[in-house]
Amino acid sequence: MFNPHALDSPAVIFDNGSGFCKAGLSGEFGPRHMVSSIVGHLKFQAPSAEANQKKYFVGEEALYKQEALQLHSPFERGLITGWDDVERLWKHLFEWELGVKPSDQPLLATEPSLNPRENREKMAEVMFENFGVPAFYLSDQAVLALYASACVTGLVVDSGDAVTCTVPIFEGYSLPHAVTKLHVAGRDITELLMQLLLASGHTFPCQLDKGLVDDIKKKLCYVALEPEKELSRRPEEVLREYKLPDGNIISLGDPLHQAPEALFVPQQLGSQSPGLSNMVSSSITKCDTDIQKILFGEIVLSGGTTLFHGLDDRLLKELEQLASKDTPIKITAPPDRWFSTWIGASIVTSLSSFKQMWVTAADFKEFGTSVVQRRCF
């Protein structure tokens, strides 16, 4: 039985990502918890005497125990592909991270642009039937990121762990025909950086594992304004120091700007897709000519992979060459853009007007899974 008073409780927010899931409560300034989107299953079944031991581990605990586990991500390039594991991940977020009963509070879950219909309906089914949430809503990650910048019309450049996309939005609605996606993002840049470091001839006093290279990427990588000129600079101008876990200090050079270059030149990774600047231009030119100037004038960066120093300047420089003459271009790079989507969700679910947006358990019972197609857009 649906309890209408449940809508008076702060909503639970799950921002689902290939790298991390961010969880928290409506009205707060940021997510309470950020958990790696990983589920680990025991490689070997426990003897019967230990039958009560945990059969799977989630997030950082799974990564810590990875030698004894088979690790799986429920996401593939932003889309949910492992439903049993994503359910385990959500159960962990409800019970162990937030400590709330799913049946007590409404839930807003984020979704990638162009999320397939079957995924949207399956998510509603899992939340209502398996978790018993009183109300549910699905919202586009890019739209929420734009809300976090106090805009309802603009173009969002969203780049996270597994997908980079450009999403034009008009008056709060994404324009799906003009969305452009690139399967080059954070994890690909980390892998490329590792290859470049190993090929650079450096000898490293400790093993270069993914976690270490990821840390180097986040702390030292940058986007060059003019990549060819950057390669011709003297070594002492580009070298940066990094302190390894064992205390040794290493100096790193060109790989620090060569790895993020893959966002602008995906051909480095064998992709024939257009780079970031061409994606933005392509998305905007697919929109009605009446709003193209508005979109060029309200470009918002979102996601952890847009945090590279220099990315916004490079994007602006290339867009000025691609756009028609005298087109005003503005790029907003919010400092908290790793959490922009979550913050946008927190804002909208705090509005009293959002109450009428929720898909309630009664709605689900009456109309079935297809209700999300009519109500969540």
UniProtKB/Swiss-Prot annotation:
Keyword Membrane: no
Entry superkingdom: Eukaryota
Cellular compartments per GO CC: actin cytoskeleton; cytoplasm
Record's keyword terms, sorted: Cytoplasm, Cytoskeleton
Record localization: Cytoplasm, Cytoskeleton
The keyword Oxidoreductase appears for this protein: no
Pfam families tied to this protein: Actin (PF00022)
Predominant cellular place of this UniProt entry's protein: cytoplasm
SUPFAM superfamilies, alphabetized: Actin-like ATPase domain (SSF53067)
Sequence similarity: Belongs to the actin family.
Protein name per Swiss-Prot or TrEMBL: Actin-related protein T2
Gene from which the chain derives: ACTRT2
